[in-house]
């Protein structure tokens, strides 16, 4: 009897590392609910929305707390439901992955995704960190990095890495020629071994392309509109509508609940745009300095 109970609990995980007894479909996630935005562990769903011209055009819920694994299935869901494919996709750094970039490239969709290290790149501490790959010289022809001390880091081997979705990426491992007597060792190498770099060339190449996209005038406009339209929609749902928790239980019922909520949001948005004579407005424009 006890083994039967254990087997039932194990089956309820469905590939996750947690679930709620009151709603087996829900996964424990960090919720920022108090006034200090402190993380509290509670059962919930990862709600994703896609916004176009200030309207929520797609929404879905996921049991994975990490946004990065929701991008590809969400884009597939949008195309299936709407019957067409958007030419570009704008998202924040939480959605960045080599798999996501590859999917967008294969589908001929332009990526406007912030790199995960985008904010760090701007910090002085990051720019002065000699251990970072970004602060080393790279010879593309010879495929060699040169560290702050002038030592060469050459490619030793390539290892394959598979994500939880099954996507396989190649990681090139670089190693320095000797760090034992280097005067900068404490600032660079964190182990007693020689300095190593684990580099995904595929990710770097696609990340650089996306980075150039977000720096363009169009990219700046899209990122601004993502902040206004997507974050604004979540703000209205959570604060203006005071929607703090789902009333129903189970993934199917919760999805119906969020769909109804988004439908109400879109009706209010349409009314607001009609009142403001903004029905032909699609993107907020950048202010001229």
Report the location of each language-model feature:
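Anion-binding and metal-coordination hotspots
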Residues: 1-289
């Amino acid at each position: 009897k006890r083994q039967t109970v254990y087997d039932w609990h194990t089956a309820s995980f469905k590939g996750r590392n947690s679930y709620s007894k009151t709603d087996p479909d829900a996964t424990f996630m960090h919720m920022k609910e108090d006034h200090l935005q402190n993380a509290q562990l509670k059962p919930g769903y990862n709600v994703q929305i896609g916004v176009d011209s200030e309207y929520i055009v797609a929404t879905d819920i996921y049991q994975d707390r990490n946004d990065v694994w929701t991008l590809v299935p969400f884009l597939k869901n949008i195309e299936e439901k709407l019957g067409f494919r958007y030419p570009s996709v704008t998202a924040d750094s939480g959605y960045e992955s080599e798999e996501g970039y590859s999917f967008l490239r294969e589908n001929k969709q332009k990526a406007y995704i912030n790199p995960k290290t985008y904010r760090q790149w701007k910090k002085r501490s990051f720019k002065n960190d000699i251990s970072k790959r970004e602060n080393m010289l790279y010879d593309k022809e010879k495929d060699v990095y040169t560290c702050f001390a002038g030592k060469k880091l050459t490619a030793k081997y390539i290892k394959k890495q598979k994500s939880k979705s099954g996507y396989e990426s190649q990681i090139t491992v670089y190693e320095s020629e000797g760090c034992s007597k280097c005067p900068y060792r404490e600032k660079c190498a964190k182990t007693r071994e020689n300095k190593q770099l684990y580099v995904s060339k595929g990710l770097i190449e696609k990340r650089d392309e996306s980075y150039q996209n977000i720096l363009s005038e169009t990219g700046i406009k899209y990122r601004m509109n993502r902040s206004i339209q997507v974050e604004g929609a979540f703000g209205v749902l959570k604060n203006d509508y005071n929607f703090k928790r789902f009333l129903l239980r189970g993934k199917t019922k919760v999805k119906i609940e969020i769909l109804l909520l988004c439908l109400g949001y879109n009706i209010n948005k349409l009314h607001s745009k009609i009142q403001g004579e903004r029905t032909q407005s699609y993107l907020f424009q950048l202010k001229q300095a």
